[in-house]
């Protein structure tokens, strides 16, 4: 990758490129999701101390996906990456009910950010492969998603591990970025 | 005019004359860029004496001694093996760039954690944390050779000037409308030039803290800039595929180097300011005559984007680093490829010579840095240990210490 490639990905993307920001609490499954998108091996994933960037092709778009570490001490640095974001993907560990409040708060703060205003948001209710996972409808309700009125949004249940639901979510992304980019 | 004393400059080799003119103390340099251990010393002395009125017959013996000393220094062989001296768990997020001061006594690291840290090279102790930027600290420099100031350029669109000794911020330069991604002090340390994703470069007055000039004309992001040795020219490399040559301090654009068919990744002057080397995503590197702005050579061979280019300190060699995982060394005069550096298992994003010119250091996405013999292309050592890709690397002036900055949030000192 190198610093120069990072600068190139920093530019506001040309029409057929989409800049996607992948955020969420630590252990939500962002990096697994990123690797699933890029069809890479997901067996050895460690907590992200910084960021990962991958480009994937989907429906005629080049999706430049930025996966940013979610540990509490580095969350204040999420805003380093807000500039030129086309779509925000927010990942939630659906089985970690103890942290629903925390993740809801972080999401609410993101939606308040001026630099992300109007940016379409896809919420992945991840880890649906676990028996204890809350269904997407329950999470949507718990997080008061229906109160979001300043942008298009969608919640999609998925398992980054098995890949189920991931493509449906990305289809939504492509459809909605399309509207915004035109 | 009266000669007061001689100063010796090892790299690039030269003799500095300190003299008095009209009551004022002045200096001038005699560059000996082509000096080698086998050069005929008497011939060199004779030439200097012919060209330089300050060197009178009574001084020739002294000059000869100085040249012999330079030859001895140039001829020194160094087969040193580097070992990992320290891992600095410097930052809580990935590093960007690293840089030494001239003497190598301290160095700086920039990071995604919005800070720049100042380190003592000998002990690996942290001396200062420069805090205040609101986004990634990307471009960092000491005002070498003085080394008493540090400039930082950030994604927060500002540049800050700091005291290297106390860590105090002197000025915050505001005016760019996008990320600052490259910067340089002029050699006199009176100006800072910054290059930005907003397609402009700006010059800032260090004393007053005011903007001195805006250099507009590029059609895309500026990602590389550098001054020439005397400080009367600045070059800017852009994603618009061109390099501009600006006259300083007027800010007049005197040449636009047009010819590359891809984004520029780096642009550098050689020591005597006669040549400019440019690296491009079009897989080539070009050499340009800096006086007339004409392309004099296209250095080909790489199979993927050229990500960095550098001259050795005398300007005789050009080294290129590429996304194809190889580096190449070319002769600046014959433009022939002298060596191909093969071994990295990922793209090479940074390349530098030591001041002596007998070692090349490369940084790669394969998590290693490697040391090479520029003349044979032989890999002398693989510096292993980083757990993620290496973004930046540097030699100190002595050539006996290396620092590497990585995406793994650490900086490593090797010596």
UniProtKB/Swiss-Prot annotation, chain B:
Record has Glycosyltransferase as a keyword: no
Entry keyword Cytoplasm: yes
UniProt keywords, alphabetically: Cell projection, Cilium, Cytoplasm, Cytoskeleton, Flagellum, Repeat, WD repeat
Signal peptide: none
Cellular localisation: Cytoplasm, Cytoskeleton, Flagellum basal body; Cytoplasm, Cytoskeleton, Flagellum axoneme
InterPro entries: G-protein_beta_WD-40_rep (IPR020472), WD40/YVTN_repeat-like_dom_sf (IPR015943), WD40_repeat_CS (IPR019775), WD40_repeat_dom_sf (IPR036322), WD40_rpt (IPR001680)
GO cellular component terms, semicolon-separated: ciliary basal body; cilium; cytoplasm; motile cilium
Chief location: cytoplasm
GO biological process: one example: outer dynein arm assembly
Domain of life according to the entry: Eukaryota
WD repeat coordinates: 90-129, 132-174, 175-214, 217-256, 259-298, 301-340, 343-384, 386-415
Function: Required for axonemal dynein assembly and ciliary motility in ciliated organs, including Kupffer's vesicle, during embryogenesis. Facilitates the onset of robust cilia motility during development.
Family: Belongs to the WD repeat WDR69 family.
Name this polypeptide is given: Dynein assembly factor with WD repeat domains 1
Organism listed in the record: Xenopus tropicalis
């Amino acid at each position: 990758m190198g610093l120069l490639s990072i600068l190139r990905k920093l530019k506001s993307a040309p029409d057929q490129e989409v800049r996607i920001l992948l955020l969420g609490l630590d252990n939500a499954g962002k990096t697994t999701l990123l690797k699933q998108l890029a069809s890479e091996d997901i067996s050895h994933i460690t907590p992200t101390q910084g960021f990962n960037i991958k480009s994937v092709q989907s429906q005629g778009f080049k999706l430049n996906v930025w996966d940013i570490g979610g540990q509490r001490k580095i969350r204040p640095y999420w805003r380093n990456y807000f500039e030129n974001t086309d779509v925000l993907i927010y990942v939630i560990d659906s089985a970690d009910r103890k942290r629903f409040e925390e993740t809801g708060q972080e999401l609410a703060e993101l939606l308040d950010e001026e630099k992300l205003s109007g940016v379409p948001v896809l919420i992945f209710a991840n880890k649906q492969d676990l028996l204890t996972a809350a269904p997407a409808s329950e999470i949507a309700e718990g997080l008061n998603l229906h109160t979001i009125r300043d942008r298009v949004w969608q919640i999609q249940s998925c398992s980054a591990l098995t890949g189920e639901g991931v493509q449906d979510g990305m289809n939504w992304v492509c459809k909605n970025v399309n509207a915004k980019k035109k | 005019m009266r000669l007061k004393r001689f100063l010796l400059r090892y790299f690039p080799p030269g003799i500095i004359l300190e003299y008095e003119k009209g009551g004022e103390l002045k200096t001038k340099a005699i560059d000996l860029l082509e000096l080698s251990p086998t050069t005929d010393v008497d011939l060199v002395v004779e030439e200097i004496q012919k060209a330089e009125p300050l060197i009178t017959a009574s001084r020739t013996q002294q000059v000869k001694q100085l040249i012999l000393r330079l030859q001895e220094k140039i001829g020194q062989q160094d087969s040193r093996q580097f070992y990992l001296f320290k891992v600095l768990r410097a930052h809580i997020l990935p590093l960007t760039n690293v840089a030494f001061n001239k003497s190598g006594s301290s160095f700086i690291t920039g990071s995604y954690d919005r800070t720049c840290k100042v380190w003592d090279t000998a002990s690996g102790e942290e001396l200062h944390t420069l805090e205040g930027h609101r986004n990634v600290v990307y471009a960092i420099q000491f005002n070498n050779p003085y080394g008493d100031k540090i400039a930082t350029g950030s994604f927060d669109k500002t540049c800050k000037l700091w005291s290297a000794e106390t860590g105090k911020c002197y000025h915050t330069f505001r005016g760019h409308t996008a990320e600052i991604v490259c910067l340089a002090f002029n050699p006199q340390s009176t100006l800072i030039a910054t290059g930005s994703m907003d397609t402009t470069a700006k010059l800032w007055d260090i004393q007053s803290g005011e903007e001195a000039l805006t250099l507009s004309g590029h059609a895309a992001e500026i990602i590389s800039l550098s001054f020439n040795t005397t400080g009367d020219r600045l070059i800017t490399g852009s994603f618009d595929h061109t390099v501009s040559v600006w006259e300083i301090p007027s800010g007049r654009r005197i040449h636009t180097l047009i010819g590359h068919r891809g984004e520029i990744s780096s642009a550098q002057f050689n020591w005597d300011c006669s040549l400019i080397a440019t690296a491009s995503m079009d897989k080539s590197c070009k050499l340009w005559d800096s006086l007339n702005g004409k392309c004099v050579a296209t250095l080909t061979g790489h199979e993927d984007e050229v990500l960095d280019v550098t001259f050795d300190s005398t300007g005789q060699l050009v080294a290129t680093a590429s996304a194809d995982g190889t580096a190449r060394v070319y002769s600046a005069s014959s433009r022939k490829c002298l060596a191909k550096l093969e071994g990295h298992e990922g793209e090479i994003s940074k390349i530098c010579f030591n001041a002596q010119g007998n070692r090349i250091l490369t940084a790669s996405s394969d998590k290693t840095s490697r040391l090479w013999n520029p003349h044979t292309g032989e890999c002398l050592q693989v510096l292993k240990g980083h757990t993620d890709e290496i973004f930046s690397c540097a030699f100190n002036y002595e050539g006996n210490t290396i620092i590497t900055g990585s995406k793994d949030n650490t900086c490593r000192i090797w010596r």
